[in-house]
Amino acid sequence: MKKQAVSFMLCAVIAMVITPVALNVKSAKAEGQGCYKSFYSEDYNSGTKIAGENEFEHFPIASMCKIMTLLLCFEEISEGRLTLDEKICASENASGMGGSQVFLEAGADYSASDLIKSICVASANDSCVAMAERIAGGEEAFVQSMNERAAALGMENTVFINCTGLPGAGQYSCAADVARMLRELMKHEEYFAFSKIWTDKIVHPEGRETEMANTNKMIRAYSGCDAGKTGFTNDAGFCLAASAMRGNMRVISVVIGADSSKTRFDRTREAFDYAFANYTNKIIFEKGIPLDERCPVQGGKISNVSVKAKDDVCIFTSRNDHDEIFYELEFDRIKAPVKEGDAVGKAFIYKNNIQVAETILLSNENVKKISYFDSLRKAAEYWIL
Protein backbone atom coordinates (compact mmCIF):
# COMPACT_ATOMS: atom_id res chain seq x y z
CA MET A 1 0.00 0.00 0.00
CA LYS A 2 2.87 2.35 0.80
CA LYS A 3 4.35 1.85 -2.67
CA GLN A 4 0.99 2.59 -4.27
CA ALA A 5 0.66 5.79 -2.28
CA VAL A 6 4.14 6.95 -3.27
CA SER A 7 3.42 6.17 -6.94
CA PHE A 8 0.22 8.18 -6.76
CA MET A 9 2.05 11.15 -5.25
CA LEU A 10 4.76 11.01 -7.93
CA CYS A 11 2.14 10.94 -10.67
CA ALA A 12 0.48 13.96 -9.15
CA VAL A 13 3.77 15.85 -8.99
CA ILE A 14 4.60 14.97 -12.59
CA ALA A 15 1.17 16.13 -13.69
CA MET A 16 1.76 19.52 -12.06
CA VAL A 17 5.30 20.24 -13.24
CA ILE A 18 5.46 18.89 -16.80
CA THR A 19 4.80 21.44 -19.50
CA PRO A 20 3.06 19.70 -22.39
CA VAL A 21 4.55 19.84 -25.88
CA ALA A 22 1.98 20.25 -28.63
CA LEU A 23 -0.62 18.14 -26.80
CA ASN A 24 -2.71 19.39 -23.92
CA VAL A 25 -1.90 16.47 -21.64
CA LYS A 26 -1.93 18.57 -18.49
CA SER A 27 -5.66 19.08 -18.66
CA ALA A 28 -6.17 15.40 -19.47
CA LYS A 29 -4.37 14.41 -16.29
CA ALA A 30 -6.33 16.95 -14.28
CA GLU A 31 -9.50 15.21 -15.42
CA GLY A 32 -8.26 11.91 -13.97
CA GLN A 33 -7.30 10.20 -17.21
CA GLY A 34 -4.15 8.69 -15.76
CA CYS A 35 -0.49 9.61 -15.59
CA TYR A 36 2.83 8.34 -16.89
CA LYS A 37 6.53 9.07 -16.53
CA SER A 38 7.52 9.75 -20.12
CA PHE A 39 6.04 10.15 -23.58
CA TYR A 40 7.28 10.74 -27.12
CA SER A 41 5.83 10.73 -30.62
CA GLU A 42 7.42 11.25 -34.02
CA ASP A 43 6.92 11.01 -37.76
CA TYR A 44 8.33 7.70 -38.95
CA ASN A 45 9.62 8.85 -42.35
CA SER A 46 11.62 11.85 -41.18
CA GLY A 47 12.10 11.11 -37.49
CA THR A 48 10.68 14.56 -36.72
CA LYS A 49 9.46 14.98 -33.16
CA ILE A 50 5.75 15.70 -32.83
CA ALA A 51 5.46 15.79 -29.04
CA GLY A 52 7.38 14.71 -25.98
CA GLU A 53 7.64 14.77 -22.21
CA ASN A 54 10.79 13.60 -20.41
CA GLU A 55 11.66 11.73 -23.60
CA PHE A 56 15.38 11.59 -22.73
CA GLU A 57 14.97 10.64 -19.07
CA HIS A 58 16.20 7.21 -17.99
CA PHE A 59 13.54 4.68 -16.99
CA PRO A 60 13.15 0.89 -16.98
CA ILE A 61 11.16 -0.12 -20.07
CA ALA A 62 10.27 -3.74 -19.26
CA SER A 63 9.50 -5.88 -22.34
CA MET A 64 10.02 -3.01 -24.77
CA CYS A 65 13.64 -4.23 -24.58
CA LYS A 66 12.43 -7.02 -26.86
CA ILE A 67 12.26 -4.53 -29.72
CA MET A 68 16.05 -4.66 -29.85
CA THR A 69 15.98 -8.45 -29.49
CA LEU A 70 13.65 -8.66 -32.49
CA LEU A 71 15.75 -6.19 -34.46
CA LEU A 72 18.83 -8.39 -34.09
CA CYS A 73 16.78 -11.43 -35.10
CA PHE A 74 15.56 -9.81 -38.31
CA GLU A 75 18.98 -8.40 -39.11
CA GLU A 76 20.34 -11.94 -38.79
CA ILE A 77 17.72 -13.04 -41.32
CA SER A 78 18.51 -10.16 -43.67
CA GLU A 79 22.21 -11.08 -43.58
CA GLY A 80 21.39 -14.66 -44.53
CA ARG A 81 22.68 -16.17 -41.29
CA LEU A 82 19.24 -17.32 -40.16
CA THR A 83 16.08 -18.52 -41.89
CA LEU A 84 12.56 -18.49 -40.53
CA ASP A 85 12.15 -22.23 -41.02
CA GLU A 86 15.39 -23.15 -39.23
CA LYS A 87 14.85 -25.44 -36.25
CA ILE A 88 16.24 -24.15 -32.96
CA CYS A 89 16.65 -26.29 -29.87
CA ALA A 90 15.30 -24.76 -26.67
CA SER A 91 17.85 -25.12 -23.90
CA GLU A 92 16.96 -25.86 -20.30
CA ASN A 93 18.06 -22.32 -19.49
CA ALA A 94 15.67 -20.83 -22.07
CA SER A 95 12.72 -23.01 -21.11
CA GLY A 96 13.18 -22.06 -17.44
CA MET A 97 12.71 -18.33 -17.91
CA GLY A 98 10.01 -16.72 -15.79
CA GLY A 99 7.52 -13.99 -16.57
CA SER A 100 5.72 -13.99 -19.91
CA GLN A 101 6.44 -17.25 -21.71
CA VAL A 102 5.05 -19.91 -24.04
CA PHE A 103 6.45 -22.79 -21.96
CA LEU A 104 9.03 -24.14 -24.38
CA GLU A 105 10.06 -27.74 -23.78
CA ALA A 106 13.73 -28.15 -22.90
CA GLY A 107 15.53 -30.07 -25.63
CA ALA A 108 12.70 -29.62 -28.13
CA ASP A 109 13.13 -28.04 -31.57
CA TYR A 110 11.10 -25.02 -32.65
CA SER A 111 11.19 -23.05 -35.88
CA ALA A 112 12.70 -19.57 -35.74
CA SER A 113 9.38 -18.37 -37.14
CA ASP A 114 7.44 -19.74 -34.16
CA LEU A 115 9.91 -18.33 -31.66
CA ILE A 116 9.84 -14.87 -33.25
CA LYS A 117 6.04 -15.00 -33.48
CA SER A 118 5.77 -15.79 -29.78
CA ILE A 119 8.03 -12.83 -28.95
CA CYS A 120 5.96 -10.45 -31.06
CA VAL A 121 2.56 -11.72 -29.94
CA ALA A 122 3.00 -13.12 -26.43
CA SER A 123 6.20 -11.33 -25.33
CA ALA A 124 7.74 -14.73 -24.60
CA ASN A 125 10.86 -14.52 -22.46
CA ASP A 126 11.77 -18.16 -23.06
CA SER A 127 11.71 -17.61 -26.85
CA CYS A 128 13.90 -14.50 -26.48
CA VAL A 129 16.60 -16.47 -24.70
CA ALA A 130 16.35 -19.34 -27.20
CA MET A 131 16.91 -16.87 -30.05
CA ALA A 132 19.74 -15.14 -28.18
CA GLU A 133 21.51 -18.47 -27.65
CA ARG A 134 21.09 -19.37 -31.32
CA ILE A 135 22.38 -16.05 -32.63
CA ALA A 136 25.19 -15.28 -30.19
CA GLY A 137 25.82 -18.53 -28.35
CA GLY A 138 24.44 -17.17 -25.09
CA GLU A 139 22.40 -14.35 -23.63
CA GLU A 140 25.43 -12.48 -22.28
CA ALA A 141 27.05 -12.23 -25.72
CA PHE A 142 23.71 -11.37 -27.28
CA VAL A 143 23.20 -8.51 -24.80
CA GLN A 144 26.61 -7.17 -25.75
CA SER A 145 25.41 -7.11 -29.37
CA MET A 146 22.23 -5.34 -28.26
CA ASN A 147 24.26 -2.58 -26.63
CA GLU A 148 26.59 -2.29 -29.62
CA ARG A 149 23.61 -1.96 -31.96
CA ALA A 150 22.04 0.64 -29.69
CA ALA A 151 25.26 2.67 -29.78
CA ALA A 152 25.37 2.41 -33.58
CA LEU A 153 21.81 3.78 -33.74
CA GLY A 154 22.76 6.74 -31.54
CA MET A 155 20.72 5.50 -28.58
CA GLU A 156 22.78 7.39 -26.00
CA ASN A 157 20.32 6.89 -23.15
CA THR A 158 19.98 3.10 -23.26
CA VAL A 159 21.71 0.20 -21.52
CA PHE A 160 20.57 -3.41 -21.81
CA ILE A 161 21.48 -6.11 -19.27
CA ASN A 162 19.22 -8.86 -20.63
CA CYS A 163 17.25 -9.65 -23.78
CA THR A 164 13.84 -9.87 -22.10
CA GLY A 165 13.33 -6.69 -20.11
CA LEU A 166 13.02 -8.58 -16.83
CA PRO A 167 13.98 -6.29 -13.90
CA GLY A 168 17.66 -5.77 -13.27
CA ALA A 169 19.91 -3.07 -11.89
CA GLY A 170 21.44 -0.78 -14.48
CA GLN A 171 19.00 -1.49 -17.32
CA TYR A 172 17.25 1.57 -18.70
CA SER A 173 16.23 3.46 -21.80
CA CYS A 174 14.22 6.53 -22.75
CA ALA A 175 11.16 7.17 -24.89
CA ALA A 176 13.11 8.75 -27.75
CA ASP A 177 15.51 5.78 -27.91
CA VAL A 178 12.65 3.28 -27.86
CA ALA A 179 11.08 5.10 -30.82
CA ARG A 180 14.40 4.94 -32.65
CA MET A 181 14.81 1.18 -32.28
CA LEU A 182 11.16 0.55 -33.22
CA ARG A 183 11.67 2.69 -36.31
CA GLU A 184 14.69 0.56 -37.23
CA LEU A 185 12.80 -2.68 -36.63
CA MET A 186 9.98 -1.59 -38.94
CA LYS A 187 12.42 -1.30 -41.84
CA HIS A 188 12.22 -5.11 -41.99
CA GLU A 189 9.06 -5.97 -43.92
CA GLU A 190 9.04 -9.52 -42.52
CA TYR A 191 8.34 -8.07 -39.08
CA PHE A 192 4.81 -7.03 -40.07
CA ALA A 193 3.86 -10.63 -40.81
CA PHE A 194 4.13 -11.18 -37.04
CA SER A 195 3.30 -7.79 -35.50
CA LYS A 196 -0.25 -7.75 -36.89
CA ILE A 197 -1.22 -11.19 -35.53
CA TRP A 198 -4.04 -10.91 -33.00
CA THR A 199 -4.37 -14.49 -31.77
CA ASP A 200 -2.44 -17.63 -32.61
CA LYS A 201 -0.91 -20.65 -30.97
CA ILE A 202 2.40 -22.42 -30.79
CA VAL A 203 2.33 -26.21 -31.17
CA HIS A 204 4.98 -28.02 -29.16
CA PRO A 205 6.71 -31.12 -30.59
CA GLU A 206 4.68 -33.53 -28.48
CA GLY A 207 1.37 -31.95 -29.56
CA ARG A 208 0.77 -29.66 -26.59
CA GLU A 209 -0.52 -26.22 -27.64
CA THR A 210 -0.01 -22.81 -26.10
CA GLU A 211 -2.56 -20.16 -27.05
CA MET A 212 -1.30 -16.63 -27.63
CA ALA A 213 -3.06 -13.25 -27.73
CA ASN A 214 -1.35 -10.03 -28.78
CA THR A 215 -0.55 -7.84 -25.78
CA ASN A 216 -0.73 -4.74 -28.02
CA LYS A 217 -4.49 -4.15 -27.97
CA MET A 218 -4.07 -1.17 -30.32
CA ILE A 219 -3.73 -3.68 -33.17
CA ARG A 220 -7.49 -4.16 -33.01
CA ALA A 221 -8.55 -0.99 -31.23
CA TYR A 222 -7.00 1.62 -33.54
CA SER A 223 -7.35 1.73 -37.32
CA GLY A 224 -3.94 1.65 -38.98
CA CYS A 225 -1.99 0.39 -35.96
CA ASP A 226 0.11 -2.53 -37.15
CA ALA A 227 3.24 -2.60 -34.99
CA GLY A 228 4.44 -2.21 -31.44
CA LYS A 229 5.47 -3.76 -28.16
CA THR A 230 4.00 -3.57 -24.68
CA GLY A 231 5.83 -3.89 -21.40
CA PHE A 232 5.07 -4.13 -17.71
CA THR A 233 6.94 -4.66 -14.46
CA ASN A 234 6.31 -3.14 -11.05
CA ASP A 235 9.36 -0.91 -11.54
CA ALA A 236 8.63 0.11 -15.12
CA GLY A 237 4.87 0.49 -14.88
CA PHE A 238 2.77 0.03 -18.00
CA CYS A 239 4.69 0.78 -21.21
CA LEU A 240 3.85 0.81 -24.89
CA ALA A 241 5.66 1.55 -28.11
CA ALA A 242 3.32 1.49 -31.10
CA SER A 243 3.04 2.64 -34.68
CA ALA A 244 0.08 3.44 -36.91
CA MET A 245 -0.16 4.37 -40.57
CA ARG A 246 -2.84 6.25 -42.46
CA GLY A 247 -2.38 7.19 -46.08
CA ASN A 248 1.32 7.87 -46.59
CA MET A 249 1.95 9.00 -43.01
CA ARG A 250 3.23 6.72 -40.25
CA VAL A 251 3.49 7.79 -36.61
CA ILE A 252 5.42 6.24 -33.72
CA SER A 253 4.31 6.75 -30.12
CA VAL A 254 6.06 5.64 -26.91
CA VAL A 255 4.62 5.72 -23.37
CA ILE A 256 6.71 4.75 -20.34
CA GLY A 257 5.57 4.25 -16.76
CA ALA A 258 1.81 4.62 -17.13
CA ASP A 259 -0.26 3.95 -14.02
CA SER A 260 -2.54 1.50 -15.83
CA SER A 261 -2.84 -0.44 -19.05
CA LYS A 262 -5.78 1.77 -20.01
CA THR A 263 -3.65 4.90 -19.61
CA ARG A 264 -0.91 3.69 -21.97
CA PHE A 265 -3.46 2.80 -24.65
CA ASP A 266 -5.48 6.00 -24.19
CA ARG A 267 -2.32 8.14 -24.37
CA THR A 268 -1.19 6.37 -27.52
CA ARG A 269 -4.59 6.78 -29.15
CA GLU A 270 -4.51 10.47 -28.29
CA ALA A 271 -1.04 10.83 -29.80
CA PHE A 272 -2.10 9.14 -33.04
CA ASP A 273 -5.29 11.20 -33.32
CA TYR A 274 -3.38 14.44 -32.79
CA ALA A 275 -0.67 13.60 -35.31
CA PHE A 276 -3.02 12.52 -38.10
CA ALA A 277 -5.31 15.51 -37.55
CA ASN A 278 -2.58 18.15 -37.51
CA TYR A 279 0.23 16.88 -39.76
CA THR A 280 0.67 15.41 -43.20
CA ASN A 281 3.34 14.07 -45.52
CA LYS A 282 3.38 15.95 -48.81
CA ILE A 283 4.35 13.66 -51.68
CA ILE A 284 7.26 15.08 -53.68
CA PHE A 285 8.33 11.97 -55.60
CA GLU A 286 6.69 8.59 -55.98
CA LYS A 287 9.06 5.69 -56.49
CA GLY A 288 9.19 4.62 -60.14
CA ILE A 289 6.98 7.43 -61.47
CA PRO A 290 8.65 9.37 -64.33
CA LEU A 291 9.43 13.04 -63.80
CA ASP A 292 8.69 15.78 -66.32
CA GLU A 293 12.40 16.58 -66.58
CA ARG A 294 14.79 14.50 -68.71
CA CYS A 295 18.50 13.80 -68.37
CA PRO A 296 20.85 14.69 -71.29
CA VAL A 297 22.69 11.73 -72.81
CA GLN A 298 25.87 12.01 -74.87
CA GLY A 299 26.46 9.70 -77.81
CA GLY A 300 23.06 8.06 -77.64
CA LYS A 301 20.45 7.29 -80.28
CA ILE A 302 18.31 9.79 -78.40
CA SER A 303 19.67 12.95 -76.80
CA ASN A 304 17.97 12.63 -73.42
CA VAL A 305 16.37 10.03 -71.21
CA SER A 306 13.28 9.88 -69.01
CA VAL A 307 14.10 9.67 -65.27
CA LYS A 308 12.35 8.40 -62.12
CA ALA A 309 12.99 8.63 -58.38
CA LYS A 310 14.61 5.64 -56.70
CA ASP A 311 12.53 6.12 -53.54
CA ASP A 312 9.31 7.68 -52.36
CA VAL A 313 9.99 11.14 -50.96
CA CYS A 314 7.48 12.77 -48.63
CA ILE A 315 7.97 15.92 -46.60
CA PHE A 316 6.50 16.05 -43.10
CA THR A 317 4.68 19.31 -42.44
CA SER A 318 1.88 20.80 -40.40
CA ARG A 319 -1.47 21.00 -42.14
CA ASN A 320 -1.68 24.67 -41.12
CA ASP A 321 1.76 25.68 -42.38
CA HIS A 322 2.34 27.23 -45.78
CA ASP A 323 5.86 25.95 -46.32
CA GLU A 324 7.69 26.62 -49.55
CA ILE A 325 8.70 23.17 -50.81
CA PHE A 326 10.63 22.71 -54.05
CA TYR A 327 13.31 20.50 -55.55
CA GLU A 328 16.40 20.85 -57.73
CA LEU A 329 17.82 18.19 -60.04
CA GLU A 330 21.50 17.53 -60.58
CA PHE A 331 22.27 15.23 -63.52
CA ASP A 332 25.54 13.40 -64.01
CA ARG A 333 27.41 13.54 -67.32
CA ILE A 334 25.80 10.48 -68.89
CA LYS A 335 27.16 8.71 -71.94
CA ALA A 336 25.37 5.99 -73.89
CA PRO A 337 24.71 3.14 -73.55
CA VAL A 338 22.28 3.63 -70.68
CA LYS A 339 20.20 0.87 -69.09
CA GLU A 340 16.89 1.31 -67.35
CA GLY A 341 17.61 1.59 -63.61
CA ASP A 342 21.06 3.16 -64.05
CA ALA A 343 21.73 6.05 -61.65
CA VAL A 344 21.85 9.30 -63.63
CA GLY A 345 21.75 11.99 -60.94
CA LYS A 346 20.16 13.23 -57.74
CA ALA A 347 17.16 15.27 -56.65
CA PHE A 348 17.50 17.64 -53.70
CA ILE A 349 14.35 18.66 -51.84
CA TYR A 350 14.09 21.95 -49.96
CA LYS A 351 11.66 23.21 -47.33
CA ASN A 352 11.80 26.97 -46.77
CA ASN A 353 15.19 27.05 -48.55
CA ILE A 354 16.68 24.36 -46.29
CA GLN A 355 17.55 20.98 -47.78
CA VAL A 356 15.50 18.30 -46.02
CA ALA A 357 15.82 15.27 -48.29
CA GLU A 358 17.42 13.84 -51.38
CA THR A 359 16.98 10.85 -53.62
CA ILE A 360 18.81 9.17 -56.47
CA LEU A 361 17.44 9.55 -59.98
CA LEU A 362 17.32 6.48 -62.20
CA SER A 363 17.01 6.10 -65.93
CA ASN A 364 13.48 5.15 -66.91
CA GLU A 365 14.49 3.61 -70.26
CA ASN A 366 17.31 2.10 -72.28
CA VAL A 367 19.41 4.24 -74.58
CA LYS A 368 21.66 2.56 -77.12
CA LYS A 369 24.96 4.03 -78.15
CA ILE A 370 24.88 5.74 -81.51
CA SER A 371 26.65 3.74 -84.20
CA TYR A 372 29.07 5.00 -86.82
CA PHE A 373 26.41 4.63 -89.52
CA ASP A 374 23.87 6.48 -87.35
CA SER A 375 26.38 9.32 -87.13
CA LEU A 376 26.82 9.38 -90.89
CA ARG A 377 23.05 9.38 -91.42
CA LYS A 378 22.58 12.27 -89.00
CA ALA A 379 25.34 14.21 -90.69
CA ALA A 380 23.73 13.57 -94.10
CA GLU A 381 20.38 14.73 -92.82
CA TYR A 382 22.00 17.91 -91.54
CA TRP A 383 23.64 18.71 -94.89
CA ILE A 384 20.45 17.90 -96.80
CA LEU A 385 18.61 20.38 -94.64
Predicted features, each with a name:
Residues 15-16, 78, 279:
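Hydrophobic alpha-helical membrane context
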Residues 18, 58, 73-74, 80, ...:
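Amphipathic, positively biased hydrophobic alpha-helical segments used for protein targeting
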